[in-house]
């Protein structure tokens, strides 16, 4: 099993190209099931979850071609299987996103209940409730969601803001008969990206980027070409890496307007930030200052950046509180950071961080995707060698992270065994 060996190597300097967003690419790939035409996606990150989604779509009969760099062609005209099996779905929560488009187009779907990161119960009840409101008959049998029925437009008010639920219901509504009103929608950039692609495919959607979207069902959707939005979480992770080591790095193919709250927090921590339409520059010449964090739904501070800022705060000047309001059980990186010398205590959904001068390298275990990123960041500033184990979590969401960080001066190496 691969590991990362990391040693502090001073400030980071240079340029990094940000990949396309995993959280946008996966639903966009699933949208290929809505049409018999060809969906051409560009700026797709080559990640484990993308490969799993490719296998899932191919297992359903779709034709999926890739250049293995950043482009995919998905043709749903050959789909002949409406079942998404446990063997593939168990490793990735986003697999549930085939449910809405498959049901809407074929009138039936079977999807195994999903797996993915172990960061609390992220139920799919909002997905199912919305589909039932649109006329689906749904049963859960032997670990599978079994859905059937011709979907019709309806008013769907989600009880909680859910990114996956919004995406699943949005895709389903594009082929439903009549008008669907989706209320309490997630407004994350990745949701907006999906909606904009669906419009290119022929969907009629109003209210994109707001909490209420109205979808006029189309009889048919068509192929199109679409470029995946840049990954704001990957960009934020690299910015935290520079903030903890010092130095100056420019991120290319970035989308600063999608991550303004993260940039504001980095400025509060002492970084100098400059940005253009598609680039972000960070210059850090001092010890970071501790910053309070409270995760909330977009456009607030993203839960997917909480762990990275926890690592930054661990060596910051002063003390702070980090409050996690989105997921329970998302402080699993705290014991590992404390093993490296951090001074962090937790009480319920709040972590109290007292910054220390320096962390010490240690063997640590990744427990989920973003927790693994926080351990990499901590290792870049720790005295001695840090070994991050179980980095298969990292590979689910970061494309060549060791190569990208190495290109700007980080001492980081992937090793086997």
Curated annotation (Swiss-Prot):
Source domain of life: Bacteria
This protein's record includes keyword Cytoplasm: yes
One Pfam family here: EPSP_synthase
Keywords tagged on the record: Cell cycle, Cell division, Cell shape, Cell wall biogenesis/degradation, Cytoplasm, Peptidoglycan synthesis, Pyruvate, Transferase
Active site: 117 (proton donor)
Pathway in which this enzyme or protein is active: Cell wall biogenesis; peptidoglycan biosynthesis
Enzyme superclass (EC): transferase
Catalytic activity, reaction form: phosphoenolpyruvate + UDP-N-acetyl-alpha-D-glucosamine = UDP-N-acetyl-3-O-(1-carboxyvinyl)-alpha-D-glucosamine + phosphate
Residue numbers carrying 2-(S-cysteinyl)pyruvic acid O-phosphothioketal: 117
GO terms classed as biological process: cell division; cell wall organization; peptidoglycan biosynthetic process; regulation of cell shape; UDP-N-acetylgalactosamine biosynthetic process
Residues holding phosphoenolpyruvate: 22-23
Annotated binding of UDP-N-acetyl-alpha-D-glucosamine, by residue: 93, 304, 326
Main location: cytoplasm
One GO cellular component term: cytoplasm
Molecular functions per Gene Ontology: UDP-N-acetylglucosamine 1-carboxyvinyltransferase activity
EC number of this enzyme: 2.5.1.7
Subcellular location: Cytoplasm
Family: Belongs to the EPSP synthase family. MurA subfamily.
Alphabetical list of PANTHER family matching this protein: UDP-N-ACETYLGLUCOSAMINE 1-CARBOXYVINYLTRANSFERASE (PTHR43783:SF1)
Free-text function comment from the UniProt entry: Cell wall formation. Adds enolpyruvyl to UDP-N-acetylglucosamine.
Protein name: UDP-N-acetylglucosamine 1-carboxyvinyltransferase
Protein's organism: Neisseria gonorrhoeae (strain ATCC 700825 / FA 1090)
Upper classification of the organism: Bacteria, Pseudomonadati, Pseudomonadota, Betaproteobacteria, Neisseriales
């Amino acid at each position: 099993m691969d590991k990362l060996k990391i040693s502090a190597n001073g400030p980071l300097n240079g340029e990094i190209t940000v990949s396309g967003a995993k959280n946008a690419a996966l639903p966009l790939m699933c949208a290929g099931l809505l049409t018999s035409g060809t969906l051409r996606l560009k700026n797709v990150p080559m990640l484990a979850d993308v490969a799993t989604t490719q296998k899932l779509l191919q297992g359903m009969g779709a034709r999926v071609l890739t250049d293995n760099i950043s482009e995919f062609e998905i043709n749903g005209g050959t789909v002949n299987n409406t079942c998404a099996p446990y063997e593939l779905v168990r490793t990735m929560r986003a697999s549930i996103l085939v449910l809405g488009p498959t049901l809407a187009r074929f009138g039936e779907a079977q999807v195994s209940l999903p797996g993915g990161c172990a960061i609390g119960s992220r139920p799919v009840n909002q997905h199912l409730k919305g589909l039932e409101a649109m006329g689906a008959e749904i049963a859960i049998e032997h670990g599978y969601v079994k859905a059937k029925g011709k979907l019709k437009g309806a008013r769907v008010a989600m009880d909680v803001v859910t990114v996956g639920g919004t995406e699943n219901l949005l895709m389903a509504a594009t082929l439903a008969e009549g008008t669907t009103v989706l209320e309490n929608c997630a407004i994350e950039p990745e949701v907006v990206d999906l909606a904009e692609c669906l419009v290119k495919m022929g969907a009629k959607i109003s209210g994109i980027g707001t909490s209420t979207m109205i979808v006029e069902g189309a009889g048919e959707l068509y192929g199109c070409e679409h470029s995946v939005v840049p990954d704001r979480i990957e960009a934020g992770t690299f910015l935290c890496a520079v903030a903890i080591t010092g130095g100056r790095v420019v991120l290319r193919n970035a989308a600063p307007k999608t991550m303004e709250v993260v940039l504001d927090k980095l400025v509060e921590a002492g970084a100098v930030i400059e940005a253009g339409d598609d680039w972000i520059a960070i210059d850090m010449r001092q010890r970071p200052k501790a910053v309070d964090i409270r995760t909330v739904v977009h456009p607030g501070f993203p839960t997917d950046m909480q762990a990275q800022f926890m690592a930054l705060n661990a060596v910051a000047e002063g003390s702070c509180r980090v409050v996690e309001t989105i997921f329970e059980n998302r402080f699993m990186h705290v014991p590992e950071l404390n093993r490296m010398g951090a001074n962090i205590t937790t009480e319920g959904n709040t972590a109290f961080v007292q910054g220390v001068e320096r962390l010490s390298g240690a063997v640590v275990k990744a427990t989920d995707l973003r927790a693994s990123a926080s351990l990499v960041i901590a290792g870049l500033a720790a005295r001695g060698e840090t070994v991050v184990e179980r980095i298969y979590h990292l590979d689910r969401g970061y494309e060549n992270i060791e190569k990208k960080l190495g290109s700007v001066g980080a001492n980081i190496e992937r090793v086997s065994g």
